[in-house]
Each structure stands twice: as structure tokens, then as C-alpha cells.
């Protein structure tokens, strides 16, 4: 039993007839007519461009033809040049006032307490503390003060009081 080599063909798949020039022209006109309607709707640029996507939002949109509401000067005016202001330098404090400010500085006190507690400070904080302590030393030297002056004054006062007690009656 041999199978047939080719399947039986119907007449639909047979030779197709050639189209006439008139039919070809008509198909081309139809294709061209379809291509004409591919672009944006007429007037879409003036209408805002988003008419297809935001259908219910059109009442809230601004009209793009309306410009800025800022007033425009109509006459010739001279351009006002602003004078460059030099940065105001910090007012120089007296050494005593600056020393008082440094002694009452909360950040410095907090960092010194942390140092006394044995904590290690960051490099930035340590540099800041060192700079402030150096400034305090400079101011104290300018004012003629030292750390030991207070102790020596107290000791001298105590010695004088002791001498006065001895001279008065030994109480």
C-alpha cells in the first residue's frame, strides 16, 4: 500500500487570477486613506495635548495661552545695582568678656566632663576642645591671670589669718 505522494487539491488553492490595474489603484487609494488618519487630532496643540488621557480633568487645567500675571514695566527704568555689602566682622569682645563666654560654654563643659569620665572624643571634638583651651590660656595670660594665682591667694590669705590669730590671742 503506497500512499499518494500529493494530497488532492481543491480549486481554492489553484492559480490565482491577476488583479487588474484598476483594482490595484483602488487598493492603494484605500491604504492611503487609512494612513491619513494616524496623526493627532486637529487643534490638539492649542487644546493642551492631554485631551485623550485626562478627559474629566479638562475643566481644571489652565489655558496655555494665558501667561504670567507678574507686572511688566512699560517705561524705561534704570537698572538698580545692589551694592556689595562686606561681611560684617564679629565685634571684638574684651578679653575678659571673651574669657567669661568661654568659661560658661556648655559644649566645652560637656566635653571636658566626658574627658574627665575617661571617654575618648572624636578627632574633631578633641581639636575643638584643644583650640578653646589654648584660647583660654592666651586670654588668661593677657589678663595676667593664671591657674595657680587663685590657690596662692587663698594660701596667702590663710597664712595672714593664721598670723593674725596668733598675734591676737592664739584662739
Swiss-Prot record:
Residues 20-30 have a biased composition (Basic and acidic residues). GO terms for molecular function: GTPase activator activity. The keyword Iron-sulfur does not apply. Residues 1-99, 145-171 are annotated as: Disordered. Residues 31-40 have a biased composition (Basic residues). Keywords: GTPase activation, Ribosome biogenesis. It comes from the Bacteria. Coiled coil: none annotated. Pfam families: YihI. Residues 147-160 have a biased composition (Acidic residues). The keyword Cytoplasm does not apply. HAMAP family: GAP_YihI. Belongs to the YihI family. A GTPase-activating protein (GAP) that modifies Der/EngA GTPase function. May play a role in ribosome biogenesis. This is Der GTPase-activating protein YihI. The gene is yihI.
Amino acid at each position: 500500500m503506497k500512499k499518494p505522494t500529493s494530497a488532492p487539491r481543491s480549486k481554492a488553492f489553484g492559480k490565482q487570477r491577476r488583479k487588474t490595474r484598476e483594482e490595484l489603484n483602488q487598493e492603494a487609494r484605500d491604504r492611503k486613506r487609512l494612513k491619513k488618519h494616524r496623526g493627532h487630532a486637529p487643534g490638539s496643540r492649542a487644546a493642551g495635548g492631554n485631551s485623550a488621557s485626562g478627559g474629566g480633568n479638562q475643566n481644571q487645567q489652565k489655558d496655555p495661552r494665558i501667561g504670567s500675571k507678574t507686572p511688566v514695566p512699560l517705561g524705561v527704568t534704570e537698572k538698580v545695582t545692589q551694592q556689595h555689602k562686606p561681611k560684617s566682622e564679629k565685634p571684638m569682645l574684651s578679653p575678659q568678656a571673651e574669657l567669661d563666654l568661654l568659661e560658661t560654654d556648655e559644649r566645652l563643659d560637656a566635653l571636658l566632663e566626658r574627658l574627665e569620665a575617661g571617654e575618648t572624643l572624636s578627632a574633631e571634638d578633641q581639636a575643638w576642645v584643644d583650640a578653646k583651651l589654648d584660647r583660654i590660656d592666651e586670654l588668661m595670660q593677657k589678663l595676667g591671670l593664671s591657674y595657680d594665682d587663685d590657690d596662692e591667694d587663698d594660701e596667702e590669705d590663710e597664712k595672714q589669718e593664721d598670723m593674725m590669730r596668733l598675734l591676737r590671742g592664739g584662739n
